[in-house]
């Protein structure tokens, strides 16, 4: 539709302005781009993670706990050892939970309510890629949580077709170039049998899948 065409044009313009260009392998290897860890051994950046499971199995609670440690800089236990956490902003893009439900889940993990490092955008749509890039430039989050893949897609695509994964390919391709490097966790619901839901292109588009 017209909105999708406009979004695609804006995306192409952003990539053009960022200077996508031909380079030699030598020039590529000399780039200062590196992968850092926000939480050592768990959350690298730039990185895109798909977290999937059945409803009510704690996917959201897991991500809120990770978010709490990043927003506050509190050490995180990794393999029985407390590891330092790089403190920074957290951006939650919510298309799945009601505001009341999200508040209750935050309370369950003792999320610090006076923390000004965490930003929530309700009724998010993955089709708003240009707005996403603006938010990334403005907030520069260490962690982005998208809850959930289907909830933020708004029925725009058939989840069994490869087009459904296009926004995830954009995240992986542009992370650290079109917008500041970050860790993106995308929550995805399993099918009624507990298996993976939707096209296999979803898993192919991300850096890692957690189940």
Which residues are covered by each model-predicted region?
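Hydrophobic anchor at the beta1->P-loop junction of P-loop NTPases
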Residues: 51
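Walker A (P-loop) ATP-phosphate-binding motif of ABC ATPase nucleotide-binding domains
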Residues: 48
């Amino acid at each position: 539709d017209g909105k999708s065409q406009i979004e695609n044009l804006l995306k192409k313009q952003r990539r053009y302005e960022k200077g996508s260009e031909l380079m030699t392998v030598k020039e590529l290897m000399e780039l200062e781009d590196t992968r850092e860890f926000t939480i050592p051994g768990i959350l690298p950046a730039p990185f895109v993670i798909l977290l999937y499971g059945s409803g009510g199995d704690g996917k959201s609670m897991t991500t809120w706990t990770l978010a709490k440690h990043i927003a506050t800089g509190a050490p995180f236990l990794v393999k029985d050892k407390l590891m330092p956490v790089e403190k920074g902003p957290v951006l939650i893009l919510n298309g799945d939970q009601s505001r009341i439900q999200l508040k209750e889940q935050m309370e369950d993990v003792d999320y610090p309510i006076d923390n000004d490092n965490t930003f929530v955008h309700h009724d998010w749509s993955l089709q708003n890629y240009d707005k996403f890039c603006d938010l990334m430039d403005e907030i520069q989050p260490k962690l982005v949580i998208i809850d959930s893949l289907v909830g933020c897609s708004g029925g725009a695509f058939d989840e069994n077709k490869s087009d459904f994964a296009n926004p995830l390919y954009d995240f992986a391709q542009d992370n650290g170039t079109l917008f500041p490097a970050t860790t993106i966790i995308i929550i995805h619901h399993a099918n009624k049998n507990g298996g993976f839901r939707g096209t296999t292109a979803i898993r192919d588009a991300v850096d890692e899948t957690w189940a």
